[in-house]
Amino acid sequence: RLVNEFRDYARLPAAELKSIDLNALVAEVLQMYASENARVPVRMELDPNCPRVLGDAQQLRQVMHNLLQNAQDSTESAGPGVEGSGVLIKTHCTDSARRVRLTVLDGGTGFPEHILKRAFEPYVTTKAKGTGLGLAVVKKIADEHGSRVDIANRVADGKVVGAQVSLSFAIENVVPV
């Protein structure tokens, strides 16, 4: 499994950026996570005012799958929690930033500080059976899209209540840098 995932990571093709509706892509991907028997429920909050973005739909599907699977794993391993503390994927657009933000939040235990600093490096993982390539692939695809990617622990009442990963994409009439 590790060899196959590394091969896929190493041979990731260049992104073919086209105009895409990120909200529609999120809704499409989420259909695979909508089962009543889902390990951890996944909710979505889509900003209806989001313009189209420049992206490679296939690669962005991969990003969403990696982030959603990680979020489900983390939330599940944290055990039963607060009602509604499942996984959330959302989009948000700010007019001033001229970018669309995609964020995945989980209800897990967050990342230890030493992992948080290196989370996007290959082979860094918190999972016993993880390969450590999921977030490395996310970072590589984000770079191909000229996207900023951020990862942070979510804190409430002084304790970590999960993690979040956010990517921001240029809207379609803005040339990527």
Question: Which residue ranges define each predicted feature?
Answer:
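Conserved micro-motifs of the catalytic ATP-binding
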Residues: 12-15, 52-55, 126
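A conserved beta-strand-to-alpha-helix junction within the catalytic ATP-binding
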Residues: 16-30
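Short conserved segment of the HATPase_c
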Residues: 111-122
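Short alpha-helical Gxxx[C/S/T] motif in the catalytic ATP-binding
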Residues: 134, 138
